[in-house]
């Protein structure tokens, strides 16, 4: 029996030795030592270079004191509050959108979920500018015409009713038309000699009715009424109404009223604005001498107005025209407009 085999069976022998294994072991040890030295150098460098910086930071913190800490704390609190508000807003809007589209989300899957959470763009419906309150005019313009439909009862005088209406309302009345019947009419026909009037007895149908009525203190000569009538046998008569115009049944008059009018004298004179200045500069004795020419002009104007309106001579005493030196503000609420 071989002694080597018998001995090997009793105890194991060490592995064979190779030179390459020894070299690898030395290299690993050297690398490990180099790494350990590098780590020590880095720790030493960091320890000696960061320690002064830490000391400086501590000094700055101590110098800043509670002011820096408070500002940092306030910034953090504001940031956290803003984040909370944004999160609450997003969660609220997403919840509303999910509640609106909840029925569609079950079958839509992931792609439909993104569409449900997408907020619509543009201006929401119903957010247009609110309509403004309408402008209501509570007062009529002074130059506006107001239309009137006047019904005059049986047996009433049309001329007297229109004059009373203008006086009580303090508005000028322009008669445009009239329908109905009248009786016992006194008129002056055109082309007849001055002072001649015609009295018509019976019932007549109104074909045309026109005229104007101004409230006092306007001159009475500015008021007048013209009428055209149809008789029972087909004859047509007309002219300026001189006396009363009595209704035979209800009469409907269409008229327009106005509150602003200017009284003018034609033809206009160049020295019209200089006459009041010259009259005001004279003394009391000269006033009588200046009054005679206006009186002559007044008589001429009265005669011309009587011829135009068809008034008989016995009615001229009731007509009083204003003297020419007085302006139109005495007879109407507003003055004559400037030229």
UniProtKB/Swiss-Prot annotation:
Its main location: nucleus. Residues 24-45, 292-310 have a biased composition (Low complexity). Keywords: DNA-binding, Nucleus, Transcription, Transcription regulation. The keyword DNA-binding applies. One of its GO terms (cellular component) is nucleus. Residues 1-12, 82-93 have a biased composition (Polar residues). Gene3D superfamilies: Hypothetical protein, similar to alpha- acetolactate decarboxylase, domain 2. PROSITE patterns: PPC. Residues 102-113, 278-291 have a biased composition (Gly residues). It is found in: Nucleus. GO terms for molecular function: minor groove of adenine-thymine-rich DNA binding. Coiled coil: none annotated. The PPC domain mediates interactions between AHL proteins. This is AT-hook motif nuclear-localized protein 26. The gene is AHL26.
């Amino acid at each position: 029996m071989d002694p080597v085999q018998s001995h090997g069976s009793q105890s194991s022998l060490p592995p064979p030795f190779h030179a390459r294994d020894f070299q690898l072991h030395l290299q690993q040890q050297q690398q490990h030592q180099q790494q350990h030295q590098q780590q020590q150098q880095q720790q030493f460098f960091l320890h000696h270079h960061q320690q002064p910086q830490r000391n400086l930071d501590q000094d700055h913190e101590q110098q800043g004191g509670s002011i820096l800490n408070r500002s940092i704390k306030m910034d953090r609190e504001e940031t956290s509050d803003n984040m909370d508000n944004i999160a609450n807003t997003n969660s609220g809007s997403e919840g509303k959108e999910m509640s609106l589209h909840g029925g569609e989300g079950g079958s839509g899957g992931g792609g439909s979920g993104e569409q449900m959470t997408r907020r619509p763009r543009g201006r929401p419906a119903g957010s247009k500018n609110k309509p403004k309150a309408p402008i209501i005019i509570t007062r009529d313009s002074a130059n506006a015409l107001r239309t009137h439909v006047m019904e005059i009862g049986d047996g009433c005088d049309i001329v007297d009713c229109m004059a009373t209406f203008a006086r009580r309302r303090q508005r000028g009345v322009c008669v445009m038309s009239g329908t109905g019947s009248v009786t016992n009419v006194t008129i002056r026909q055109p082309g007849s000699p001055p002072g001649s009037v015609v009295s018509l007895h019976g019932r007549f149908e109104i074909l045309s009715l026109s005229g104007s009525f101004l409230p006092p203190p306007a001159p009475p000569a500015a008021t007048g009424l013209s009428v055209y009538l149809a008789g029972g046998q087909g004859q047509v008569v007309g002219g300026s109404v001189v006396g009363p115009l009595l209704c035979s049944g209800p009469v409907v008059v269409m008229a327009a009223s106005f509150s602003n009018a200017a009284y003018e004298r034609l033809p206009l004179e160049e020295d019209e604005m200089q006459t009041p200045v010259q009259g005001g500069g004279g003394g009391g004795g000269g006033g009588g001498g200046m009054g005679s020419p206006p009186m002559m002009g007044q008589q001429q104007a009265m005669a011309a107005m009587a011829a135009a309106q068809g008034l008989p001579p016995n009615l001229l005493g009731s007509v009083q025209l204003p003297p020419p030196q007085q302006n139109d503000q005495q007879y109407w609420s507003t003055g004559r407009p400037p030229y």
